[in-house]
A protein has these predicted regions:
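Structured catalytic core of nucleotide-sugar glycosyltransferases
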Residues: 1-108
């Protein structure tokens, strides 16, 4: 577990969201860089049946701010959020849905 304190932790519980993840991470990165925030993006794959975990692993490999956790089965949003809060190192913690319904532009 990283002990580096970030300005913001963004926790994203998800289930079968492989298509939206690259766009979401890119959008969050853009907002954080515009406002000069240090940040981490914590994605919790809640037992997805699609390739969400492969996408998370690929994003984490390219970006040290991205971390992922994978549940073997679907435990529900509350359990995924709980895991995210346990892992978060941010002074401020924000939760977002992975389906692009929440705009990262609202973070600041």
């Amino acid at each position: 577990m990283s002990t580096n304190v970030q300005d913001i932790s963004v926790i994203i519980p998800l289930y079968n969201e492989e298509e939206s993840l690259p766009e979401l991470v890119s959008w969050i990165e853009k907002v954080m860089q515009q406002h000069h925030y240090s940040y981490e993006i914590i994605m919790i794959d809640d037992g997805s049946k699609d390739d969400s975990w492969k996408v998370i692993a690929s994003l984490a490999e390219k970006n040290p701010q991205v971390r992922g956790f994978k549940f073997k089965r679907n435990y529900g949003k509350s359990a995924a959020l709980h895991k995210g809060f346990e892992a978060a190192n941010g002074k401020v913690v924000i939760t977002m849905d992975a389906d692009l319904q929440d705009s990262p532009d609202e973070i600041p």
